[in-house]
Amino acid sequence: MFVTVHSPPATSHQPSATNHQSPATNRYHQPPTAPAIASVSLPTFLSTDPLAAEASLTLGEDAAHHMRVLRLEAGARVQLADGQGSRGVGTVVRVAKRNATVQVDSCEYVDPLPPVHLVVPIADRERMLWLGEKATELGASSWRPVMFKRSRSVSPRGEGPTFQQRLRLRMASALEQSGGAWLPMPFPDSTVETSIAAAPPGIRVVLEKGGAPIAALLAGDSSAPVTIVLGPEGGLDPSELELLAAAGFLPASLGSTLLRFETAGVAALAVARAVRG
């Protein structure tokens, strides 16, 4: 899958100035005259295939279409990312009707941010898509949707394979716009029990009015993974709160006002990144 950011055309032949285990060193070899990260003015193409210096990539029909819209021709410089820690710079070799070829000039591996995992309620589709976009910009490590007991019945709702595909596309676009290197790992719809079992050992919080300030709870070991649970707008059922408490989830507060789940998610992630990096 390839997605582009709609930036001004870049046809110059001159290079622009400028988380997971690191792959082998030779994969990220960079020629001294070609910096891996180009100017943000260059259009970006996200690949699900890993990047490798000097490799030739064949981009699909969507990417070729966007290249034609941007009037990119052979010799144009583009940015590349794979969503798994690699970013780089490439040169367009050919733009055809159904595909395009790009030569990877250089790439580099970007270490992942300290892990912050997000458990979200299944809710209104557009609001979930918006949160997925912002979660990507803020560097969420994973995204796990849960059907809580008090989740409201809305239509259309953000669930199922079709929604998950739309979410991945939205996240891909957000990654390109933000200049990030890692896409959140999207998990399928699950239950409270499944999300608890999947949470890694570390700092666990559930957003709940009356809890301790979230910044204080997240100020512990900076290397420990963080899992943040967002409840539905109807609130968490007492039985769900009991399950979370038994699994070590501490109630955390974002202040005295009542926030929508997507606002709370953005605020919690922003605090986590400010406190933990």
Indicate where each model-derived feature is located:
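Glycine/charged-rich beta-loop-alpha catalytic/anionic-binding loops adjacent to active sites
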Residues: 57-59, 113-117, 224-227, 246-254
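Active-site/ligand-binding-proximal alpha/beta "capping" segment
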Residues: 202-241, 249-254
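Non-catalytic positions within long, well-ordered alpha-helices that form the structural scaffold/packing
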Residues: 68, 136-139, 245
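Structured adenosyl-cofactor binding patch, chiefly the S-adenosyl-L-methionine
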Residues: 238-277
